[in-house]
């Protein structure tokens, strides 16, 4: 734990969010030094506390532990008038209020932005919605399906697949954190708060990037291509003697260098492969020409040889291998936090590295209502 104040030291966040998108956003704020108070339902708490297996050795959901460090927890029933009043006091003391309930839940408790801003004009509120501003449910899986992401994920001619992690939720959380920081910058300049809104459908469409642009600018509806890139070749999974590796040849110079490593100079001089656009057009012929040579050595050998020549390539790692690689290249990818009970929890380190105000890991993911009494005491006049 660093004694250096974080960039958001002194910032107070009332966090009514649960599951992933909101908790990712508030964990980022907490890593940067904010005091985040997580509001949970008495008894059951955040939905993800019940999501398992796997569980930690202490029986806590690994899912929950992954996105809830650097937070304190207060247990409040928003349908109970006294608890709702406590929630309002907490919110009016905060700089930021964040939630991802269905529309109307916060308003019924008197916690919506319009109600709160009548008492705190400088308050920043953030709402993470589902598929737009309506009442559609906000689940990542639905967003991936309905937002087009699954239509471009999977093998050509095969079934559509979701990404292997709730990526839309993660990205929505990142956008929420960015929006909150932008709103705070405006507040610091003008004294005026505002409402920040992020929804899963817009987040999914934004994440489509070049695939969305293919439709918007060229009228091309993208489809599934497995691990291939629609506009670059070879930029895909190749098969060596013992399994796959990936290569990302981004320009013609790299392609010529690749041909040199593979001892296939004739491919570099072949008009079908001389330019990237030609290689995309003649992808199947190119892959057929590469296949016999690639079968002569292992994936690790090819990655070593190609990498030494400056050609972007890599192994297809499992998660444990990915963390091992991070250690090998000098990254501190694991952040260990110690709870008041002395239990150590390993979490994924924040990828932000700030030279003057580094991220810190001060608090382990809390138990349900672990800090209720202390927080109530802070709210007492």
Residues covered by each model-derived region:
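Terminal low-complexity tails and localization/encapsulation signals of metabolic enzymes
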Residues: 1-12, 223, 239, 321-381
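Glycine-rich beta-alpha junction loops
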Residues: 43, 130-132, 200-205, 242-244, ...
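Aromatic-enriched alpha-helical interface/lid elements that frame and gate functional surfaces
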Residues: 228, 233-309, 313
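Conserved PLP cofactor-binding pocket of PLP-dependent enzymes
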Residues: 307-328
């Amino acid at each position: 734990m660093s004694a250096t104040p974080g960039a958001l030291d002194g910032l107070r966040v009332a966090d009514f969010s649960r599951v992933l998108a909101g908790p990712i956003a508030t964990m980022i704020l907490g890593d940067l030094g904010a005091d985040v108070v997580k509001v949970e339902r008495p008894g059951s708490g955040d939905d993800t506390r019940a999501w398992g297996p796997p569980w930690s050795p202490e029986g806590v959901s690994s899912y929950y532990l992954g996105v809830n460090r650097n937070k304190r927890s207060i247990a409040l029933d928003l349908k109970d008038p006294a608890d709702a009043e406590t929630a309002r006091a907490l919110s009016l003391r905060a700089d930021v209020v964040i939630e991802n309930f269905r529309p109307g839940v916060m308003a019924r408790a008197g916690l919506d932005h319009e109600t709160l801003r009548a008492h705190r004009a400088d308050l920043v509120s953030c709402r993470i919605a589902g598929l737009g501003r309506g009442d559609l449910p906000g689940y990542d899986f639905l967003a991936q399906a309905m937002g087009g992401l699954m239509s471009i994920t999977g093998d050509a001619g095969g079934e559509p697949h979701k990404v292997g992690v709730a990526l839309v939720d993660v990205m929505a959380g990142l956008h929420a954190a960015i929006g909150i920081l932008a709103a705070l910058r405006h507040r610091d300049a003008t004294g005026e708060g505002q409402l920040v809104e992020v929804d899963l459908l817009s987040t999914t469409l934004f994440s489509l990037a070049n695939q969305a642009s293919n439709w918007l600018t060229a009228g091309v509806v993208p489809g599934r291509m497995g691990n291939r890139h629609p506009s670059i070749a070879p930029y895909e999974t190749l098969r060596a003697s013992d399994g796959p590796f990936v290569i990302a040849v981004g320009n013609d110079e790299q392609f010529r260098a690749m041909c040199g490593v593979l001892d296939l100079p004739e491919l570099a001089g072949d008009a079908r492969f001389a330019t990237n656009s030609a290689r995309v057009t003649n992808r199947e012929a190119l892959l057929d020409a590469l296949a016999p040579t690639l079968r002569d050595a292992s994936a690790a050998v090819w990655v070593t040889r190609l990498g030494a020549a400056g050609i972007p390539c890599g192994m297809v790692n499992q998660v444990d291998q990915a963390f091992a690689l991070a250690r090998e290249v000098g990254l501190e990818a694991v952040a260990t936090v110690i709870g008041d009970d002395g239990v150590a929890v390993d979490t994924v380190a924040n990828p932000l590295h700030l030279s003057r105000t580094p991220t810190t890991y001060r608090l382990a993911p809390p138990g349900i209502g672990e800090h209720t009494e202390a927080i109530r005491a802070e709210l007492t006049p």
